[in-house]
A protein has these predicted regions:
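Helix-start/N-cap signature of alpha-helical segments
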Residues: 1-2, 21, 40-52, 84-92, ...
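Alpha-helical solenoid repeat architecture
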Residues: 1-14, 30, 47-64, 80, ...
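Elongated alpha-helical scaffolds that mediate protein-protein interactions in large eukaryotic proteins
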Residues: 9-26, 42, 62-72, 105-107, ...
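Amphipathic alpha-helical segments within extended alpha-helical solenoids and repeat-rich scaffolds
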Residues: 24-38, 76-85, 137-155, 195-234, ...
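Acidic, serine/threonine- and proline-rich low-complexity regulatory regions
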Residues: 82, 105-106, 126-131, 149-166, ...
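Intrinsically disordered, low-complexity domain-flanking/linker segments in eukaryotic proteins
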Residues: 106-124, 232-238
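Long, charge-rich C-terminal accessory regions
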Residues: 148, 153-171, 175-193
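Long C-terminal extensions of eukaryotic subunits of large macromolecular complexes
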Residues: 228-331
């Protein structure tokens, strides 16, 4: 019950999240550490574990929470949890997604950002960058891409059905790892190398590229269906049209955020010649094109920069998205 109450309080109150000290993060990670070599025995223990994970995620939406997460070696614990091809691997991915997502500008009292949302300026919050580097340095990419590719047999496939958001979280984490590491640096290249052929591995990059394009096309189709449905409703005389905001929310519900994260990964990978050729081929097979990816990313950047429809402060967004804008220009 204590785990459930803690989770409810942290989710319900931004003030509670801001006031929680590093001691709470440490206690939660200690509870989580038990599952490095243990799988929940029943649904009650599973619910307990999910509450612990949710609490860590909520704390990780604040700068202080991210700092405590790094200091308490939370990144290293995540990698250990992801070594287990069971439920802990997928639940720990949720924590990684929240931990990598940079926090919003210092709020009055506002809800936590959606993972992958607005980025705080690098000079005011460096924890997401540190988390990205630590995760890569601790060999976390191996397990992240195993999750992306649904490796692990029938038991893992069953878990993916229980946690259908896993694909979105995996792509979001890859997108943030690419954005939070300096282009051309060893950590950045280690992420990119998963999509690029090398002398040591000339095969595995193709399935990774194909998987990203597959998810990109699937989410694009869902968003397109939402657009079509909204257009039909907007043409109905009895429909109360609330304009662009309602359309935006409908598109988000259908998978716009996931599509944008996949677009970001595609944009980074397409900077390399061989992957770019394969991306173009796979996109065409799915009825997509790089022009569509460019258009969606342009909309993503401009919407956030406008400071509307859920974007953070204009200055923070401009600083954070400058690198992405440069990538977009080179497509």
């Amino acid at each position: 019950y204590a785990a459930e109450v803690t989770s409810i309080l942290l989710q319900a109150s931004p003030a509670v999240r801001l006031e929680a000290g590093s001691g709470l993060m440490d206690a939660l990670l200690r509870c989580l550490a038990k599952y490095r070599k243990h799988t929940p025995d029943d649904e009650i223990e599973m619910e307990y574990l999910e509450n612990i994970v949710d609490s860590v995620c909520m704390l990780a939406t604040t700068p202080a929470g991210k700092r405590a997460f790094v200091e308490c070696e939370g990144v290293e614990l995540l990698v250990l949890l992801q070594k287990q091809p069971q439920v802990c691997r997928l639940l720990s991915l949720k924590i990684l997604d929240y931990a990598l997502s940079p926090p919003p500008p210092p709020p009055s009292q506002q809800p936590p950002p959606q993972p992958g949302g607005s980025v705080d300026a690098a000079d005011t919050n460096r924890e997401p960058h540190a988390i990205a580097r630590r995760y890569i340095d601790n060999m976390g990419l191996k397990y992240l891409f195993a999750i992306l590719m649904h490796r692990g047999g029938p038991a893992v496939k069953k878990l993916h059905k229980r946690y259908p958001e896993t694909d979105e979280r995996a792509v979001s984490c890859i997108a943030w790892l690419l954005r939070l590491t300096e282009r051309g640096s060893p950590p950045h290249w280690r992420v990119l190398a998963k999509f690029v052929p090398s002398a040591a591995d000339s095969l595995s990059w193709k399935p990774h590229v194909d998987r990203i394009v597959e998810l990109n096309a699937a989410w694009a189709e869902r968003v397109r269906d939402a657009d079509d449905q909204f257009a039909r409703r907007a043409n109905d005389d009895d429909y109360d049209d609330n304009g662009a905001e309602e359309r935006y929310l409908a598109r988000m519900d259908s998978g716009l955020f996931a599509l944008q994260m996949a677009d970001i990964v595609v944009a980074f990978v397409a900077q390399e010649q061989q992957p770019a050729v394969r991306i173009e081929q796979q996109l065409r097979r799915k009825g997509r094109s790089m022009a569509a990816v460019q258009s969606e990313l342009t909309e993503y950047i401009s919407t956030r920069a406008a400071g509307t429809l859920g974007a953070g402060s204009t200055n923070a967004v401009a600083s954070a998205d400058s690198g992405l804008s440069g990538i977009l220009e080179r497509l």
